[in-house]
Amino acid sequence: LLSSSFTVFAEELPHGNVGAAQVEQLLEVDVVNGTERIINLPEMAAYSMIADTASSDVALGRSIIGGSDERTKITNTTSSPYYGIAYLSITMEDGKTYRGTGFMISPNTMLTAGHCLKSSTSQAKSVTVYPGRNGTSKPITAKMTKYYVDTKYTGSEADWDYGIMVLDSNVGNTTGWFGLHGTSGSSIGTTNVKVTGYPADLDGYYMWTCGGTVSNITTNRFQHTADTAGGESGSPTYFYNGSYGNQAVGIHTHGGNYS
């Protein structure tokens, strides 16, 4: 069975705050001022809390379930919830460039996969964010000013493969953002999820989505059966939760062959 792994949030936080129960310290990197520091989560304002190796334009690994590709293209990328999902153009300190996906969780805060921001040999120097990108159409643009990765993440630890990005403008007031839904024991509140992002194998400048079911839930991760590809690292895994709207239950980090 091919499926992908996700970071699972610690508790239900319908207003878009990340639960602190599983995280002790974060590495803060200010890409504008070139500074770094270790911080404890309580030091951060809630709305600022907001990460495949970061998938390059040529790394087109696929995870297709059952031999049939069920991904569908999103044509109206400025409708909800799609406008809150962004194409990421990533430049690392070693000069290499990558692509990825991220999603808004507040006016100026975004989640992505940790490996989109940090590897074992380098880390992000700059990230340009294109919410709702649709081919050459880029309806809104922002730049990353700071990012946070867990201090336990050094480039390969799947349990801590998440990242938080702070942007230079409140683009979320235009795009909208996802609420966050956490776990309760072995349940994440749903058995069906969607994964929406920018897969590189289908011309990665367009947004695609696929539904799937969840399984193998652990404290920090779970697997799903949605079809994905390189470039979708950092995509939201989410479901529609009635009056709470679209809530993310995880961050897509990688695909693999699970049997």
List the predicted regions and their residue ranges:
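Residue-level recognition of beta-strand termini and adjacent short loop/turns
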Residues: I105-S106, T218
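Acidic glycine-/aspartate-rich tracts in secreted/extracellular proteins
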Residues: C116-K118, R133-S137, D168-N173, P199-D201, ...
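Catalytic nucleophile loop of clan PA
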Residues: D227-H252
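Cytochrome P450 catalytic-core helices
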Residues: N108, T112
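Sec-dependent N-terminal signal peptides of Gram-positive bacterial secreted proteins and lipoproteins
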Residues: L1-A10
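Conserved catalytic-core segment of clan PA serine endopeptidases
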Residues: G61-Y83, S89-G95, R99, K118, ...
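Protease-domain processing segments flanking chymotrypsin-fold serine proteases, especially trypsin-like
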Residues: A10-T101
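Chymotrypsin/trypsin-fold serine protease catalytic domain
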Residues: G135, A158-T228
